[in-house]
Amino acid sequence: MRIASCELAGRTGHEAGRQLLARLYREETGEDLPGILTTDRGKPYFPDSPWHFSISHTPRHAFCVLSRNNVAIDGEELDRNIRLKLADKILSASEKAQFDVAKNRERALLTFWVLKEAAAKLSGEGLRGYPNHTHFSLEDPRVTEMDGCLVAVMEE
């Protein structure tokens, strides 16, 4: 599994993400980026390649992960203004219990958010069912800081 990130530097998140993907794919395979299709639920994939990928972007950064396994990535800026009221809507009971005692509730909510987004991307189902039907931990090792962002990467 390979992960790359960059600042947008005047590009759209889509443009920067595709450039990261093209670079990772070339580094891994020595080939140009193949065509990309999307599933009926919008998950992008390579139809004729054993490689899987995921792209995420924020207002300032893009992230890409490339793997031989189904993979997903989500990133959020650490300084993102997130409404704490969302916790009641998107957290499961076990997650809400962790959130309620967290020293930094904004960071806790962002942690759960990137985990939920990555899980939704990994499943290919989107956020339906994910906001409050998960049981993630604030100590989940799949979340890391990268370029001033919280980033979650999941792989099957």
Regions found by a protein language model. Give the residues of each.
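Core catalytic alpha/beta fold that binds nucleotide/phospho-ligands
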Residues: 1-156
